[in-house]
Regions:
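NAD(P)-cofactor binding segment of oxidoreductase domains
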Residues: 57-122, 152-156
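Mid/C-terminal beta-alpha module of Rossmann-like enzyme folds, strongest
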Residues: 220-283, 288-290, 321-365
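Rossmann-fold cofactor-recognition segment
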Residues: 37-50, 68-69
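A conserved pocket-lining segment of Rossmann-fold NAD(P)-dependent short-chain dehydrogenase/reductase
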Residues: 190-212
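N-terminal Rossmann NAD(P)H-binding glycine-rich loop of SDR-like oxidoreductase domains
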Residues: 3-23
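Glycine-rich Rossmann NAD(P)(H)-binding loop
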Residues: 6, 176, 200-207, 235-242, ...
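Conserved beta-loop-beta element that borders a ligand/cofactor-binding pocket
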Residues: 137-144, 152-178
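A conserved structural motif in NAD(P)-dependent oxidoreductases
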Residues: 210-217, 302
Length: 365
Protein backbone atom coordinates (compact mmCIF):
# COMPACT_ATOMS: atom_id res chain seq x y z
CA UNK A 1 0.00 0.00 0.00
CA UNK A 2 1.03 3.61 -0.55
CA UNK A 3 0.93 5.29 2.85
CA UNK A 4 1.52 8.94 3.69
CA UNK A 5 2.43 9.69 7.31
CA UNK A 6 2.00 13.31 8.39
CA UNK A 7 4.28 14.08 11.33
CA UNK A 8 6.45 11.00 11.20
CA UNK A 9 9.54 12.25 13.04
CA UNK A 10 8.42 12.82 16.64
CA UNK A 11 7.77 10.40 19.49
CA UNK A 12 5.25 8.02 17.92
CA UNK A 13 5.68 8.69 14.19
CA UNK A 14 9.03 6.97 13.56
CA UNK A 15 7.73 3.75 15.09
CA UNK A 16 4.65 3.92 12.85
CA UNK A 17 6.89 4.37 9.81
CA UNK A 18 9.08 1.45 10.89
CA UNK A 19 6.07 -0.83 11.39
CA UNK A 20 4.70 0.05 7.96
CA UNK A 21 8.04 -0.35 6.16
CA UNK A 22 8.74 -3.64 7.93
CA UNK A 23 5.40 -4.89 6.62
CA UNK A 24 6.43 -3.99 3.06
CA UNK A 25 4.38 -0.83 2.51
CA UNK A 26 5.52 2.17 0.45
CA UNK A 27 5.79 5.03 2.95
CA UNK A 28 6.22 8.77 2.45
CA UNK A 29 6.68 11.10 5.43
CA UNK A 30 5.49 14.73 5.47
CA UNK A 31 7.22 16.68 8.23
CA UNK A 32 8.96 19.95 9.01
CA UNK A 33 12.53 18.72 9.32
CA UNK A 34 14.39 15.58 8.38
CA UNK A 35 15.21 13.96 11.74
CA UNK A 36 15.39 10.46 10.34
CA UNK A 37 16.47 8.79 7.12
CA UNK A 38 13.09 8.34 5.48
CA UNK A 39 12.97 6.49 2.20
CA UNK A 40 10.76 9.24 0.85
CA UNK A 41 9.84 12.54 2.43
CA UNK A 42 8.22 15.89 1.74
CA UNK A 43 9.32 18.79 3.91
CA UNK A 44 6.66 21.25 4.96
CA UNK A 45 4.51 22.73 7.71
CA UNK A 46 1.24 20.95 8.50
CA UNK A 47 -0.15 24.27 9.79
CA UNK A 48 -0.22 25.29 6.12
CA UNK A 49 -1.13 21.94 4.61
CA UNK A 50 -3.01 23.47 1.70
CA UNK A 51 0.20 25.03 0.40
CA UNK A 52 1.49 21.51 -0.36
CA UNK A 53 -1.75 20.11 -1.78
CA UNK A 54 -0.32 19.51 -5.25
CA UNK A 55 2.64 17.47 -4.03
CA UNK A 56 0.58 15.54 -1.52
CA UNK A 57 -2.28 14.71 -3.87
CA UNK A 58 0.17 13.58 -6.54
CA UNK A 59 1.20 10.73 -4.24
CA UNK A 60 -2.30 9.22 -4.58
CA UNK A 61 -1.94 7.51 -1.21
CA UNK A 62 -4.10 4.56 -0.31
CA UNK A 63 -4.03 5.75 3.30
CA UNK A 64 -3.04 9.00 5.01
CA UNK A 65 -2.08 8.75 8.70
CA UNK A 66 -2.05 12.12 10.48
CA UNK A 67 -0.05 11.73 13.68
CA UNK A 68 -0.26 15.39 14.71
CA UNK A 69 -3.86 16.54 14.28
CA UNK A 70 -4.83 18.86 17.13
CA UNK A 71 -7.96 20.76 16.08
CA UNK A 72 -11.08 20.62 13.97
CA UNK A 73 -9.63 23.32 11.72
CA UNK A 74 -6.58 21.18 10.95
CA UNK A 75 -8.75 18.11 10.35
CA UNK A 76 -11.00 20.04 7.96
CA UNK A 77 -7.95 21.15 5.97
CA UNK A 78 -6.74 17.54 5.85
CA UNK A 79 -10.05 16.31 4.45
CA UNK A 80 -10.15 19.10 1.86
CA UNK A 81 -6.62 18.35 0.64
CA UNK A 82 -7.12 14.60 0.22
CA UNK A 83 -10.75 14.30 -0.87
CA UNK A 84 -10.61 12.56 -4.25
CA UNK A 85 -6.90 11.77 -3.93
CA UNK A 86 -6.69 9.31 -1.01
CA UNK A 87 -8.76 6.24 -0.21
CA UNK A 88 -8.84 6.65 3.58
CA UNK A 89 -7.70 8.89 6.43
CA UNK A 90 -6.45 7.66 9.81
CA UNK A 91 -6.48 10.19 12.64
CA UNK A 92 -4.84 9.86 16.03
CA UNK A 93 -7.23 10.99 18.72
CA UNK A 94 -7.05 10.59 22.49
CA UNK A 95 -8.90 8.92 25.33
CA UNK A 96 -9.34 12.45 26.70
CA UNK A 97 -12.44 12.80 24.48
CA UNK A 98 -14.50 10.81 26.98
CA UNK A 99 -16.79 12.48 29.50
CA UNK A 100 -14.87 10.59 32.19
CA UNK A 101 -11.85 12.77 31.45
CA UNK A 102 -13.97 15.88 31.99
CA UNK A 103 -15.24 14.48 35.29
CA UNK A 104 -11.66 13.70 36.30
CA UNK A 105 -10.63 17.31 35.63
CA UNK A 106 -13.72 18.76 37.32
CA UNK A 107 -15.18 20.10 34.06
CA UNK A 108 -18.23 17.85 33.72
CA UNK A 109 -21.06 17.94 36.29
CA UNK A 110 -23.05 14.89 37.28
CA UNK A 111 -22.26 11.33 38.30
CA UNK A 112 -19.12 9.31 37.72
CA UNK A 113 -18.80 7.42 34.44
CA UNK A 114 -18.67 3.62 34.70
CA UNK A 115 -15.45 1.99 33.52
CA UNK A 116 -13.94 0.48 31.50
CA UNK A 117 -14.81 3.02 28.83
CA UNK A 118 -15.72 1.66 25.42
CA UNK A 119 -15.87 3.41 22.07
CA UNK A 120 -19.58 4.01 22.74
CA UNK A 121 -19.05 5.72 26.11
CA UNK A 122 -20.26 9.36 26.35
CA UNK A 123 -17.93 12.10 25.18
CA UNK A 124 -17.23 15.38 26.92
CA UNK A 125 -19.84 18.09 26.54
CA UNK A 126 -17.26 20.81 27.21
CA UNK A 127 -14.59 21.34 24.61
CA UNK A 128 -10.95 22.22 25.27
CA UNK A 129 -10.33 20.28 28.48
CA UNK A 130 -7.02 21.98 29.18
CA UNK A 131 -6.71 25.63 30.35
CA UNK A 132 -4.73 28.10 28.19
CA UNK A 133 -1.66 27.91 30.43
CA UNK A 134 -1.57 24.12 30.05
CA UNK A 135 -1.90 24.45 26.25
CA UNK A 136 0.98 26.94 26.23
CA UNK A 137 3.15 24.51 28.20
CA UNK A 138 2.26 21.63 25.87
CA UNK A 139 3.05 23.76 22.81
CA UNK A 140 6.59 24.17 24.10
CA UNK A 141 6.90 20.37 23.97
CA UNK A 142 4.75 19.63 20.93
CA UNK A 143 5.28 22.33 18.32
CA UNK A 144 2.39 21.08 16.16
CA UNK A 145 -0.25 21.79 18.83
CA UNK A 146 -2.49 24.77 18.04
CA UNK A 147 -4.51 27.01 20.35
CA UNK A 148 -7.75 25.19 19.53
CA UNK A 149 -6.52 21.78 20.70
CA UNK A 150 -9.39 19.33 21.14
CA UNK A 151 -9.75 15.89 19.63
CA UNK A 152 -13.57 15.85 19.59
CA UNK A 153 -13.81 18.30 16.64
CA UNK A 154 -10.98 16.35 14.98
CA UNK A 155 -13.04 13.16 15.13
CA UNK A 156 -16.16 14.89 13.79
CA UNK A 157 -14.32 16.18 10.74
CA UNK A 158 -12.51 12.90 10.01
CA UNK A 159 -15.67 10.81 10.27
CA UNK A 160 -18.05 13.34 8.74
CA UNK A 161 -17.08 13.31 5.06
CA UNK A 162 -19.22 11.17 2.74
CA UNK A 163 -16.55 10.80 0.07
CA UNK A 164 -13.46 10.09 2.17
CA UNK A 165 -13.69 7.32 4.80
CA UNK A 166 -11.91 7.85 8.09
CA UNK A 167 -10.58 5.76 10.96
CA UNK A 168 -10.07 7.17 14.46
CA UNK A 169 -7.67 5.75 17.04
CA UNK A 170 -8.10 6.97 20.62
CA UNK A 171 -4.67 6.75 22.19
CA UNK A 172 -3.79 6.29 25.88
CA UNK A 173 -1.02 7.85 27.94
CA UNK A 174 1.93 6.75 25.81
CA UNK A 175 5.27 5.95 27.43
CA UNK A 176 8.61 4.79 26.07
CA UNK A 177 12.04 6.02 24.99
CA UNK A 178 11.73 9.56 23.70
CA UNK A 179 8.70 10.45 25.85
CA UNK A 180 8.89 14.24 25.94
CA UNK A 181 6.53 14.37 28.93
CA UNK A 182 8.95 12.20 30.95
CA UNK A 183 6.13 10.27 32.62
CA UNK A 184 8.51 8.01 34.58
CA UNK A 185 10.76 10.82 35.82
CA UNK A 186 9.09 11.66 39.19
CA UNK A 187 9.50 8.03 40.26
CA UNK A 188 13.03 7.58 38.92
CA UNK A 189 14.32 10.85 40.38
CA UNK A 190 13.26 9.71 43.85
CA UNK A 191 15.02 6.41 43.29
CA UNK A 192 18.18 8.14 42.06
CA UNK A 193 18.03 10.51 45.04
CA UNK A 194 18.08 7.55 47.42
CA UNK A 195 14.56 7.93 48.80
CA UNK A 196 13.50 4.99 50.99
CA UNK A 197 9.87 5.19 49.89
CA UNK A 198 7.63 6.64 47.21
CA UNK A 199 4.49 8.22 48.68
CA UNK A 200 1.06 8.57 47.09
CA UNK A 201 -2.23 10.05 48.26
CA UNK A 202 -4.69 7.19 48.74
CA UNK A 203 -6.89 8.44 45.87
CA UNK A 204 -3.90 8.67 43.55
CA UNK A 205 -2.71 5.23 44.63
CA UNK A 206 -6.04 3.62 43.73
CA UNK A 207 -6.60 5.54 40.49
CA UNK A 208 -6.16 3.82 37.13
CA UNK A 209 -5.97 5.10 33.57
CA UNK A 210 -5.06 3.88 30.05
CA UNK A 211 -1.44 3.33 29.10
CA UNK A 212 0.46 2.07 26.09
CA UNK A 213 4.10 1.51 25.16
CA UNK A 214 5.08 3.57 22.15
CA UNK A 215 6.09 0.68 19.85
CA UNK A 216 2.90 -1.19 20.70
CA UNK A 217 0.76 1.87 20.05
CA UNK A 218 2.53 2.35 16.71
CA UNK A 219 1.80 -1.28 15.84
CA UNK A 220 -1.91 -0.69 16.47
CA UNK A 221 -1.85 2.40 14.26
CA UNK A 222 -0.12 0.58 11.40
CA UNK A 223 -2.55 -2.33 11.70
CA UNK A 224 -5.65 -0.12 11.56
CA UNK A 225 -4.20 1.88 8.67
CA UNK A 226 -3.62 -1.18 6.49
CA UNK A 227 -6.74 -3.22 7.28
CA UNK A 228 -9.77 -2.21 5.22
CA UNK A 229 -12.09 -3.44 7.97
CA UNK A 230 -11.06 -0.39 9.99
CA UNK A 231 -12.73 2.05 7.57
CA UNK A 232 -15.33 4.11 9.39
CA UNK A 233 -14.40 2.66 12.78
CA UNK A 234 -13.21 4.08 16.10
CA UNK A 235 -10.75 2.10 18.21
CA UNK A 236 -9.43 2.52 21.72
CA UNK A 237 -5.75 1.64 22.01
CA UNK A 238 -4.49 0.64 25.46
CA UNK A 239 -2.87 -2.19 27.34
CA UNK A 240 -5.35 -4.91 28.25
CA UNK A 241 -4.25 -4.98 31.89
CA UNK A 242 -4.58 -1.71 33.76
CA UNK A 243 -2.68 -1.28 37.02
CA UNK A 244 -3.73 1.20 39.70
CA UNK A 245 -1.18 3.95 40.14
CA UNK A 246 0.30 2.28 43.22
CA UNK A 247 0.95 -0.97 41.39
CA UNK A 248 2.22 0.86 38.30
CA UNK A 249 4.67 2.83 40.42
CA UNK A 250 5.93 -0.44 41.90
CA UNK A 251 6.33 -1.91 38.40
CA UNK A 252 8.48 1.03 37.29
CA UNK A 253 10.53 1.00 40.48
CA UNK A 254 11.12 -2.72 40.15
CA UNK A 255 12.23 -2.33 36.54
CA UNK A 256 14.82 0.15 37.83
CA UNK A 257 16.15 -2.45 40.26
CA UNK A 258 15.01 -0.48 43.31
CA UNK A 259 14.26 -1.95 46.70
CA UNK A 260 11.97 0.18 48.82
CA UNK A 261 8.34 0.84 49.66
CA UNK A 262 5.45 2.42 47.82
CA UNK A 263 3.06 3.79 50.44
CA UNK A 264 -0.51 5.03 50.12
CA UNK A 265 -1.19 7.83 52.59
CA UNK A 266 -4.33 8.99 54.37
CA UNK A 267 -5.40 12.41 53.00
CA UNK A 268 -4.70 14.08 56.36
CA UNK A 269 -1.12 12.83 56.28
CA UNK A 270 -0.35 13.60 52.63
CA UNK A 271 2.10 16.44 51.85
CA UNK A 272 0.58 19.29 49.86
CA UNK A 273 2.69 18.65 46.77
CA UNK A 274 1.29 15.10 46.53
CA UNK A 275 -2.39 16.09 46.74
CA UNK A 276 -4.34 14.98 43.62
CA UNK A 277 -5.41 17.72 41.22
CA UNK A 278 -8.85 16.53 40.16
CA UNK A 279 -11.59 14.07 41.02
CA UNK A 280 -9.64 10.84 41.36
CA UNK A 281 -12.79 8.93 42.22
CA UNK A 282 -13.30 8.97 38.44
CA UNK A 283 -11.15 6.26 36.92
CA UNK A 284 -10.13 6.49 33.27
CA UNK A 285 -9.75 2.82 32.38
CA UNK A 286 -10.62 1.96 28.78
CA UNK A 287 -11.38 -1.27 26.96
CA UNK A 288 -9.32 -2.11 23.88
CA UNK A 289 -11.39 -5.22 23.13
CA UNK A 290 -12.72 -3.89 19.82
CA UNK A 291 -9.37 -3.54 18.04
CA UNK A 292 -8.26 -6.90 19.42
CA UNK A 293 -11.41 -8.72 18.34
CA UNK A 294 -11.99 -7.01 14.98
CA UNK A 295 -8.41 -6.62 13.74
CA UNK A 296 -6.54 -9.19 15.83
CA UNK A 297 -4.31 -6.64 17.52
CA UNK A 298 -1.67 -7.91 19.96
CA UNK A 299 1.22 -6.01 21.52
CA UNK A 300 4.55 -7.06 19.93
CA UNK A 301 6.58 -5.86 22.95
CA UNK A 302 5.95 -7.44 26.36
CA UNK A 303 5.37 -5.23 29.38
CA UNK A 304 8.60 -6.08 31.20
CA UNK A 305 10.65 -5.25 28.11
CA UNK A 306 8.72 -2.03 27.57
CA UNK A 307 9.31 -0.92 31.15
CA UNK A 308 13.02 -1.78 31.04
CA UNK A 309 13.59 0.16 27.81
CA UNK A 310 11.71 3.18 29.11
CA UNK A 311 13.51 3.20 32.47
CA UNK A 312 16.92 2.94 30.77
CA UNK A 313 16.11 5.84 28.45
CA UNK A 314 14.67 8.05 31.18
CA UNK A 315 17.64 7.53 33.48
CA UNK A 316 19.96 8.54 30.64
CA UNK A 317 17.79 11.46 29.46
CA UNK A 318 16.28 13.39 32.38
CA UNK A 319 14.36 16.57 31.56
CA UNK A 320 16.39 19.75 31.26
CA UNK A 321 14.07 21.67 33.58
CA UNK A 322 12.85 20.20 36.87
CA UNK A 323 10.09 21.61 39.07
CA UNK A 324 11.67 21.08 42.47
CA UNK A 325 8.36 21.83 44.20
CA UNK A 326 7.36 18.29 43.18
CA UNK A 327 10.16 16.91 45.35
CA UNK A 328 9.65 18.35 48.84
CA UNK A 329 11.60 15.64 50.63
CA UNK A 330 11.34 17.34 54.05
CA UNK A 331 7.55 17.07 53.87
CA UNK A 332 7.84 13.49 52.63
CA UNK A 333 10.13 12.59 55.53
CA UNK A 334 7.56 13.97 57.95
CA UNK A 335 4.83 11.85 56.32
CA UNK A 336 7.09 8.80 56.46
CA UNK A 337 7.48 9.27 60.19
CA UNK A 338 3.71 9.42 60.72
CA UNK A 339 3.03 5.69 60.44
CA UNK A 340 -0.60 6.14 61.46
CA UNK A 341 -1.22 7.75 58.06
CA UNK A 342 0.19 4.76 56.14
CA UNK A 343 -2.83 2.95 54.70
CA UNK A 344 -1.22 0.44 52.32
CA UNK A 345 2.35 -0.54 51.50
CA UNK A 346 3.96 -2.41 48.62
CA UNK A 347 7.52 -3.54 49.27
CA UNK A 348 9.29 -3.61 45.93
CA UNK A 349 11.45 -6.70 45.55
CA UNK A 350 9.21 -9.00 47.62
CA UNK A 351 5.99 -7.94 46.01
CA UNK A 352 2.40 -9.05 46.13
CA UNK A 353 -0.08 -6.90 44.29
CA UNK A 354 -3.74 -6.99 45.31
CA UNK A 355 -6.02 -8.32 42.60
CA UNK A 356 -9.40 -6.82 41.85
CA UNK A 357 -11.10 -8.95 44.51
CA UNK A 358 -8.59 -7.97 47.18
CA UNK A 359 -6.75 -11.31 47.16
CA UNK A 360 -2.98 -11.42 46.92
CA UNK A 361 -1.26 -12.57 43.77
CA UNK A 362 2.45 -12.66 43.00
CA UNK A 363 3.82 -10.10 40.59
CA UNK A 364 7.23 -9.50 39.10
CA UNK A 365 8.46 -5.92 39.12
Amino acid sequence: MRVLVIGGSGFIGPHVVDALENAGHDVTVFHRASKRSARREILGDRQHLGDYAGQLRALKPDVVIDVILSSGRQARALVNVFRGAASRLVALSSCDVYRACGVLHGLEPGPLEPVPLTEESPLRTNLQTYPPERITMLQQVFGWLDDEYDKIPVEREIRGDRELPGTVLRLPMVYGPGDMLHRFFPILKRIRDGRPAILLHEKTAAWSGPRGYVENVASAIALAATDSRAAGRIYNVAESETFPEMGWTAKIAGAAGWRGSVIALHPDGTPQHLMPAGNYDQHWTVSSARIREELGYEEPVELETALARTVDWELANPPEEIDLKQFDYAAEDEALGDEASHLRTITVGTLSLPSGDGAKRPAVV
